[in-house]
Amino acid sequence: MSSPAQPAVPAPLANLKIQHTKIFINNEWHDSVSSKKFPVLNPATEEVICHVEEGDKADVDKAVKAARQAFQIGSPWRTMDASERGRLLNKLADLMERDRLLLATMESMNAGKVFAHAYLLDVEISIKALQYFAGWADKIHGQTIPSDGNIFTYTRREPIGVCGQIIPWNGPLIIFTWKLGPALSCGNTVVVKPAEQTPLTALHMASLIKEAGFPPGVVNIVPGYGPTAGGAISSHMDIDKVSFTGSTEVGKLIKEAAGKSNLKRVTLELGGKSPCIVFADADLDSAVEFAHQGVFFHQGQICVAASRLFVEESIYDEFVRRSVERAKKYILGNPLNSGINQGPQIDKEQHNKILGLIESGKKEGAKLECGGGRWGNKGFFVQPTVFSNVTDEMRIAKEEIFGPVQQIMKFKSMDDVIKRANNTTYGLAAGVFTKDLDKAITVSSALQAGMVWVNCYLAVPVQCPFGGFKMSGNGRELGEHGLYEYTELKTVAMQISQKNS
């Protein structure tokens, strides 16, 4: 069976004008309390796209008050039929489809995503996430429980309340919908802080949320910096839950702030150093391509990046040769331009961090097969880089690089590679490539990771739970489990005169 044809990709919008740069509270646009603004850059050109209102604690306080008011008993949102919440989410998905070209252009310009990927993948995945959680809205059920004695007992899954949602810069639109969808499906209200590098699609989504008909205060969006706006959300005494996607370092700060404030519920999707294991019996062409995409997609700026590639000894040299050949095919440049398949890193800080880790690989004795430096004179570009002869103690084998850098290591036995793969503080994802079913089941069961792919990589269906073991986070996004992260489970027990079966 042939796979369905991909839709044609139109040209990006020319001369895109940014309409929404203010803080969104109570379905209205606000200047920041401080009157401060911050610049938003195009990482391919280093030029300022626009200036956005800089929210801080005072603005977060305003947003939380609006969200709390919208969550009051008897409010339009609390009394709304669950099916109507689902209809509103589907309406929002329809508006995203209408504005697909605008959203994709904005995501490519602001986040450095290759335009075709933004159009075909980012916007599509975001729409599907909203549609999936829209379907759940009137299917969130409690249970009746046959308890002992003349007691009638049942459970309710209730919305938690006001939820803070802190969005990363590497998937601004996708993660926005992954968090917004389940929160609203369950009946919560939200205060969203997009990453300071990439606030534009979130602010456009605010206009669509109002257009879709969500009541005022249900969704509030406060752009700003992590230590100020993000810190205010994490430590706020009237926010009931915080969900964060980003680095493990910042995740620890958020969990600490949540504990020191009101012990708010916390969901964290954090860093990774994901192993990808290729056995000698694997389909070599397929394994090379999946492993390549697993670390080079979106310039390596993905939390599940296959950044520790273990290849069985007997096929190691050939695998390295093919991987280098594949990496050399990239055409770098402005991701809005046709024919480009690698864009820039998000900002100067990330760009310099990646180049520093590449230098550490050279100094520590890894063999640089290709790339290894900056590309071009303008924009935050890094050459596609492949290292061979990498050993486990090197920094490039231990630290999250978040860039287009592939580390290829050699292994001899299954037992050996399982131990090495698990020898990390992270546990987000892993990949296994083999035609042997016994190997596939044994290794996937042994790996300490929240998502294990077998003979594929980067497949993250919205219907399935996604999240990490160990220091890669707490809780899950997506799927039924991701939905329940936005509910409190209440037991109601009432005395009755006589119980009957």
Swiss-Prot record:
<feature type="site" description="Transition state stabilizer">
    <location>
        <position position="170"/>
    </location>
</feature>
<comment type="pathway">
    <text>Alcohol metabolism; ethanol degradation; acetate from ethanol: step 2/2.</text>
</comment>
<comment type="similarity">
    <text>Belongs to the aldehyde dehydrogenase family.</text>
</comment>
<feature type="modified residue" description="Phosphoserine">
    <location>
        <position position="413"/>
    </location>
</feature>
<keyword id="KW-0007">Acetylation</keyword>
<feature type="modified residue" description="N6-acetyllysine">
    <location>
        <position position="128"/>
    </location>
</feature>
<feature type="modified residue" description="N6-acetyllysine">
    <location>
        <position position="435"/>
    </location>
</feature>
<dbReference type="GO" id="GO:0006001">
    <property type="term" value="P:fructose catabolic process"/>
</dbReference>
<keyword id="KW-0560">Oxidoreductase</keyword>
<feature type="active site" description="Nucleophile">
    <location>
        <position position="303"/>
    </location>
</feature>
<dbReference type="Pfam" id="PF00171">
    <property type="entry name" value="Aldedh"/>
</dbReference>
<dbReference type="InterPro" id="IPR015590">
    <property type="entry name" value="Aldehyde_DH_dom"/>
</dbReference>
<dbReference type="InterPro" id="IPR016160">
    <property type="entry name" value="Ald_DH_CS_CYS"/>
</dbReference>
<dbReference type="GO" id="GO:0005737">
    <property type="term" value="C:cytoplasm"/>
</dbReference>
<dbReference type="InterPro" id="IPR016161">
    <property type="entry name" value="Ald_DH/histidinol_DH"/>
</dbReference>
<comment type="subunit">
    <text>Homotetramer.</text>
</comment>
<keyword id="KW-0963">Cytoplasm</keyword>
<feature type="modified residue" description="N6-acetyllysine">
    <location>
        <position position="353"/>
    </location>
</feature>
<feature type="modified residue" description="N-acetylserine">
    <location>
        <position position="2"/>
    </location>
</feature>
<keyword id="KW-0520">NAD</keyword>
<dbReference type="InterPro" id="IPR016162">
    <property type="entry name" value="Ald_DH_N"/>
</dbReference>
<feature type="modified residue" description="N6-acetyllysine">
    <location>
        <position position="367"/>
    </location>
</feature>
<protein>
    <recommendedName>
        <fullName>Aldehyde dehydrogenase, cytosolic 1</fullName>
        <ecNumber>1.2.1.3</ecNumber>
    </recommendedName>
</protein>
<feature type="modified residue" description="N6-acetyllysine">
    <location>
        <position position="252"/>
    </location>
</feature>
<dbReference type="GO" id="GO:0004029">
    <property type="term" value="F:aldehyde dehydrogenase (NAD+) activity"/>
</dbReference>
<keyword id="KW-0597">Phosphoprotein</keyword>
<feature type="modified residue" description="N6-acetyllysine">
    <location>
        <position position="91"/>
    </location>
</feature>
<feature type="modified residue" description="N6-acetyllysine">
    <location>
        <position position="410"/>
    </location>
</feature>
<dbReference type="InterPro" id="IPR016163">
    <property type="entry name" value="Ald_DH_C"/>
</dbReference>
<comment type="function">
    <text>Can oxidize benzaldehyde, propionaldehyde and acetaldehyde. No detectable activity with retinal.</text>
</comment>
<dbReference type="InterPro" id="IPR029510">
    <property type="entry name" value="Ald_DH_CS_GLU"/>
</dbReference>
<feature type="modified residue" description="N6-acetyllysine">
    <location>
        <position position="419"/>
    </location>
</feature>
<feature type="binding site">
    <location>
        <begin position="246"/>
        <end position="251"/>
    </location>
    <ligand>
        <name>NAD(+)</name>
    </ligand>
</feature>
<feature type="active site" description="Proton acceptor">
    <location>
        <position position="269"/>
    </location>
</feature>
<dbReference type="GO" id="GO:0006068">
    <property type="term" value="P:ethanol catabolic process"/>
</dbReference>
